[in-house]
């Protein structure tokens, strides 16, 4: 049952662009992804696949962050890039895009996981970022060619964002934010989850404070992520995390 789909995938990739692919039985398939639930059998990519083997932090957060959230994201992405951590995001608008753009000012150690075909990009305003990362960085997807994005794929790619990371950082989120779905995947995969606290008077962005109450590791400085990296993950209660988009 696997081989026909693999053959079909090979035909797709041969008929498309310069994208490459690896499979679950290939020597260069990311070891971290082999450890997650339901790893993609075929992984398509543009760029430097060896980045998945380096120390890394997945950055997630609001699609429409506040000025505070934007500044926090820029600060942490900047400092982590200077520490040679690979920055990983799903390339969504907002926090994810801000983190990638800031990190690329320092380093080419950036990874984006797409919810669409490897030869496309999402959201559409990230065309220049996509093209830059294909040359300097890494773009990966479990979908071939220009397959259009679907609602369930937006959620599914978060398991890969978390899966290839060593830890997950949320810089700013709303209450019951859909970005909390990555927390569920991180817990399932045994990854540490870090959250930057928001102001108690900011009623629009209490999501991170809620995560901290549930057991996420609070960070108030970029160096906290490195200093606390050996702490075992806490038993977050993810029963309240909505897995539906």
Model-derived segments and their meaning:
Residues 20-245:
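Glycine-biased, small-residue-rich flexible motifs in mid-sequence functional cores and linkers
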Residues 1-8, 12-13:
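Single conserved hydrophobic/aromatic residue that forms the stacking wall/gate
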């Amino acid at each position: 049952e696997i081989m026909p789909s693999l053959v079909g995938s090979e035909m797709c990739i041969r008929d498309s662009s310069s994208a490459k692919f690896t499979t679950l039985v290939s020597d260069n398939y990311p070891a971290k992804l082999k450890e997650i639930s339901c790893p993609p059998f075929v992984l398509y990519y543009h760029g430097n696949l060896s980045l998945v083997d380096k120390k890394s932090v997945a950055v997630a957060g609001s699609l429409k962050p506040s000025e505070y959230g934007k500044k926090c994201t820029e600060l942490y992405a900047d400092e982590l890039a200077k520490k040679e951590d690979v920055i990983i995001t799903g390339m969504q608008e907002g926090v994810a895009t801000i983190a990638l753009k800031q990190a690329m000012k320092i380093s080419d150690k950036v990874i984006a996981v797409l919810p669409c075909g490897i030869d496309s990009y999402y959201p559409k305003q990230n065309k220049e970022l996509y093209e830059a990362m294909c040359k300097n960085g890494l773009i990966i997807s479990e979908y071939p060619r220009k397959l259009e994005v679907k609602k369930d794929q937006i959620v599914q790619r978060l398991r890969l964002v978390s899966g290839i990371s060593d830890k997950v950082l949320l810089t700013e989120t709303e209450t019951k934010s859909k970005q909390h779905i990555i927390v569920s995947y991180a817990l399932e995969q045994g990854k540490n989850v870090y959250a930057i606290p928001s102001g108690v008077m900011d009623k629009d962005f209490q999501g991170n404070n809620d995560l901290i109450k549930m057991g996420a590791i609070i960070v108030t400085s970029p160096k906290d992520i490195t200093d606390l990296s050996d702490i075992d993950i806490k038993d977050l209660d993810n029963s309240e995390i909505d897995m539906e988009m």
